[in-house]
Amino acid sequence: MNPLWSMSSGSVRKRAEGEEKTLAGDVKTSPPRSAPKKQLPSIPKNALPISKPTSPAPAAQSTNGTHASYGPFYLEYSLLAEFTMVVKQKLPGVYVQPSYRSALVWFGVIFIRHGLYQDGVFKFTVYIPDNYPDGDCPRLLFDIPVFHPLVDPTSGELDVKRAFAKWRRNHNHIWQVLMYARRVFYKIDTTSPLNPEAAVLYEKDIQLFKSKVVDSVKVCTARLFDQPKIEDPYAISFSPWNPSVHDEAREKMLTQKKPDEQHNKSVHVAGLSWVKPGSVQPFSKEEKTVAT
């Protein structure tokens, strides 16, 4: 036998036995290396101490619950929506116009066409709270105090809180206040009056009440051409009849065609009609024969 072969085979056998012992025994692991500690750089001399950041101040809130920076835009949008609703309601005999200087002030006038206050023309001003629609109800003051149980004889203010004790957002609207101001002249309420004299006369002496109402209407009519109490370009004012100005406008109003008539003329009727005009009987229209 070759001696080199016997030596190599012996060494291989010893190495295999050693590996078996190593596998059969516990697995030896090397001890973990300790990582070097991180050190912060030294603080330079004359360095100022670091102060903790202050917590941000809470966002300012406006009176209507929105962010203060959005408050004016939210209020303007709310008032624009309110005025749009007033226009869509088409309140009979009631006309309003927002002020040029403040959207919180509206000028208006009410025309009474029948009843105890017939022929009355009453100018008024609506004052809207600056925290609308989360505040109280708007105030309505007549330019000239009207003789009425619900109108203060000194200030001319209408008792609006009677109908809107608590203004409810998204439920109450300004057009309802205007409708209420119109309704009080047709349906008289004398409970808890602002003008006790008017309430007593309405209950005890209706003829004297009517006489004072007629006098009040005459006073308002006589002062109809007075300058507005508030100097504003959009304030409602009346002027005497001027033919050079008003005749042309009246003619246009009288000759203006109704929307229904214009719509009917613009509709193209297709096909033939076998119904005689003014009749509902089928085939009542006589057929014209062509001579041959």
Swiss-Prot record:
<dbReference type="GO" id="GO:1905719">
    <property type="term" value="P:protein localization to perinuclear region of cytoplasm"/>
</dbReference>
<feature type="compositionally biased region" description="Polar residues">
    <location>
        <begin position="1"/>
        <end position="11"/>
    </location>
</feature>
<keyword id="KW-0653">Protein transport</keyword>
<dbReference type="GO" id="GO:0006915">
    <property type="term" value="P:apoptotic process"/>
</dbReference>
<dbReference type="GO" id="GO:0045022">
    <property type="term" value="P:early endosome to late endosome transport"/>
</dbReference>
<dbReference type="GO" id="GO:0008333">
    <property type="term" value="P:endosome to lysosome transport"/>
</dbReference>
<feature type="domain" description="UBC core">
    <location>
        <begin position="74"/>
        <end position="222"/>
    </location>
</feature>
<comment type="subunit">
    <text>Component of the FTS/Hook/FHIP complex (FHF complex), composed of AKTIP/FTS, FHIP1B, and one or more members of the Hook family of proteins HOOK1, HOOK2, and HOOK3. Interacts directly with HOOK1, HOOK2 and HOOK3. The FHF complex associates with the homotypic vesicular sorting complex (the HOPS complex). Also interacts with AKT1. May interact with FHIP1A.</text>
</comment>
<dbReference type="GO" id="GO:0005634">
    <property type="term" value="C:nucleus"/>
</dbReference>
<protein>
    <recommendedName>
        <fullName>AKT-interacting protein</fullName>
    </recommendedName>
</protein>
<dbReference type="InterPro" id="IPR000608">
    <property type="entry name" value="UBQ-conjugat_E2_core"/>
</dbReference>
<dbReference type="GO" id="GO:0007032">
    <property type="term" value="P:endosome organization"/>
</dbReference>
<dbReference type="GO" id="GO:0061631">
    <property type="term" value="F:ubiquitin conjugating enzyme activity"/>
</dbReference>
<dbReference type="InterPro" id="IPR050113">
    <property type="entry name" value="Ub_conjugating_enzyme"/>
</dbReference>
<dbReference type="GO" id="GO:0015031">
    <property type="term" value="P:protein transport"/>
</dbReference>
<dbReference type="GO" id="GO:0070534">
    <property type="term" value="P:protein K63-linked ubiquitination"/>
</dbReference>
<dbReference type="GO" id="GO:0005886">
    <property type="term" value="C:plasma membrane"/>
</dbReference>
<dbReference type="GO" id="GO:0006301">
    <property type="term" value="P:postreplication repair"/>
</dbReference>
<feature type="region of interest" description="Disordered">
    <location>
        <begin position="1"/>
        <end position="64"/>
    </location>
</feature>
<keyword id="KW-0472">Membrane</keyword>
<comment type="similarity">
    <text>Belongs to the ubiquitin-conjugating enzyme family. FTS subfamily.</text>
</comment>
<keyword id="KW-0053">Apoptosis</keyword>
<keyword id="KW-0963">Cytoplasm</keyword>
<keyword id="KW-1003">Cell membrane</keyword>
<dbReference type="GO" id="GO:0070695">
    <property type="term" value="C:FHF complex"/>
</dbReference>
<comment type="function">
    <text>Component of the FTS/Hook/FHIP complex (FHF complex). The FHF complex may function to promote vesicle trafficking and/or fusion via the homotypic vesicular protein sorting complex (the HOPS complex). Regulates apoptosis by enhancing phosphorylation and activation of AKT1. Increases release of TNFSF6 via the AKT1/GSK3B/NFATC1 signaling cascade. FHF complex promotes the distribution of AP-4 complex to the perinuclear area of the cell.</text>
</comment>
<dbReference type="GO" id="GO:0030897">
    <property type="term" value="C:HOPS complex"/>
</dbReference>
<feature type="modified residue" description="Phosphoserine">
    <location>
        <position position="30"/>
    </location>
</feature>
<keyword id="KW-0597">Phosphoprotein</keyword>
<keyword id="KW-0813">Transport</keyword>
<dbReference type="InterPro" id="IPR016135">
    <property type="entry name" value="UBQ-conjugating_enzyme/RWD"/>
</dbReference>
<dbReference type="GO" id="GO:0007040">
    <property type="term" value="P:lysosome organization"/>
</dbReference>
<dbReference type="Pfam" id="PF00179">
    <property type="entry name" value="UQ_con"/>
</dbReference>
<feature type="compositionally biased region" description="Basic and acidic residues">
    <location>
        <begin position="14"/>
        <end position="23"/>
    </location>
</feature>
